[in-house]
Amino acid sequence: DMGLSDLGCYGGEIATPNLDRLAQNGLRFTRLYNNNMCTVTRAALLTGTYHTIAFRNQAINPRCATLAETLHAAGYATRMSGKWHLANIGERNQWPIQRGFEEYYGTIYGASSFFAPASLKRNNADASKDFEKPGYYYTDAISDNAAAMIAKAHKDKPLFMYVAYTSPHWPLHALEEDVAKYKGKYAKGWDTLRA
């Protein structure tokens, strides 16, 4: 869901220091293809196929194996935390657990409240009780659950951990301290960023 220009390392105006450090010490892409929608991009990423092959009828093409299915068959532990948005809510056969992930925390829907996300699941079970806890924020919950999955993973088995944040996606719900940090930044409009 994040665009290339959203990251500080590619010229974005929002501070992304941790991602910038990863980019500084890792591999940065300079030639890439992006689809105009988050769902088809996600389907292509998880199947390694062109989006018109990977995504059919609001779900991953059943004839395409996901990265999780392939890696699980090769002996990897497979975990996911975050936004799925590759199936309709009633199509459980297309949910993360059914598409190769052994453990999952996140939303089936693509966009929802960051404070009370619709379709929140832990594996295939409803997890809406999670956001009844004071201070719940979906972005933090995605990170916390991913960290917990990594911490309890077997050290002698390779791990595929897929994390899909909703934070750069509509609706844009930020914590008050994050809003305050950028107060006035866009008071003159977006055109000042293009200058």
At which residue positions do the language-model features occur?
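Formylglycine-dependent sulfatase
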Residues: 1-195
